Each structure stands twice: as C-alpha cells, then as structure tokens.
Swiss-Prot record:
GO BP term, example: viral life cycle
Protein name: Tegument protein UL55
Keyword rRNA-binding: no
Keywords recorded for this protein, A-Z: Host nucleus, Virion, Virion tegument
Cellular-component GO terms for this entry: host cell nuclear matrix; viral tegument
Chief location of this protein within or outside the cell: virion
C-alpha cells in the first residue's frame, strides 16, 4: 500500500476560511455508539439536538465541542461531504500528531474530529428552525469542560485553523505552479 503525500491531502481539503471558537455541547455520549446517536440539550428551553457522528476507537463517555466553519467571507457553510473530508484530513495520523504536539500529550483515540450537526426547532429564528453543520472535537477527559478540557479544545481550534490555512496555501501554490508550467510551454 502506498501512502498519499500530505501535500496531495491538503490540495483535496475543502476550502475552509474561518473556524469559530468552540461551543460546548451540553450532553454526553458513549464513544462506542456516538456515530448515530442524537442527544437533546436538557438545559435548552427549545428543542435543540446534537448529532456528533463520532467514530471513536475507544469506549466510555465522551463530551464534545462544536466548531462552526465557513467557506468564504460571506460565511457560506460547507456541505456535509466537505466537512467529512475536512474531518478525515485532521484525523489523518501525521496531521493528528501536530495536535498532540500542541496539546503536549497523546490523544486517547485516533479520530477525535467528526462532522456534527446542531438542530434547533424552537421557533427562535424567523424560519422556525435551523440546522448548523460543523466540526466536532470529542474528549475523553474525566472532568467534562474542566480547565484542562478547555485547553484541549483551544488546541483543537488552533489545529483546525492551522490545517485550514495549510489547505488554502497548498491550493495557492498549486495554482502558481500551474501558471508557471503554462508560461514555460508558451
């Protein structure tokens, strides 16, 4: 089996231009069945639910942070398929090692990032309901949303922003190489 060079992975990454700070999801999941389990926020007056789509290599309780991501300056939201591709990229072992370096320690699982959804049917918006898709980072720490946990979420935010800018830089470099090749042929 041949490995794909990281530069090719970044070229295929969706064009993510902004990653918002983390929003903690007020629920816990069991890692072994978090892929398809929807949880309702017990503290929310509205009917708000979370789907984290976590595919974790360990078992036990997890808690999650949600990152809204945008594609451009108009804050267009990426498609779910683009978010899945981005989550696959940031979960890629050589890329994930960068997060471990930022956190200063090993992660408990091999896939802490996934594509998640927040759905609100409260009628708070003019449309009556809204759905936001984004990137979810899940954590296995003993004390959910403790200082240590938030430091991990902060490192995850830095990691997502770094990888998204790497994808943008890789595409820009590829365009420059392509222009140079065209000039040489002429």
């Amino acid at each position: 089996m041949t490995t794909t060079p990281l530069s090719n992975l970044f070229l295929r990454a969706p064009d993510i231009t902004h990653v918002a700070p983390p929003y903690c999801l007020n629920a816990t999941w069991q890692a072994e069945n978090a892929l398809h389990t929807t949880k309702t926020d017990p503290a929310c007056l509205a009917a708000r639910s979370y789907l984290v789509r976590a595919s974790c290599s360990t078992s036990g309780p997890i808690h999650c942070f949600f990152f809204a991501v945008y594609k451009d300056s108009q804050h267009s939201l990426p498609l779910v398929t683009e978010l899945r591709n981005f989550a696959d990229l940031v979960n890629h072992p050589p890329v994930l090692r960068e997060l471990e370096d930022k956190r200063g320690g090993r992660l408990r699982c091999t896939g802490p990032f996934s594509c998640g959804t927040i759905k609100d049917v409260s009628g708070a918006s003019p449309a009556g309901e809204y759905t936001i898709n984004g990137i979810v980072y899940h954590c296995h720490c003993r004390y959910p949303f403790s200082k240590t946990c938030w430091l991990g979420a902060s490192a995850a935010l830095q990691h997502l922003r770094s990888i998204s800018s790497s994808g943008t830089a890789a595409r820009a470099a590829e365009q420059r190489r392509h222009k140079i090749k065209i000039k040489i042929k002429v």
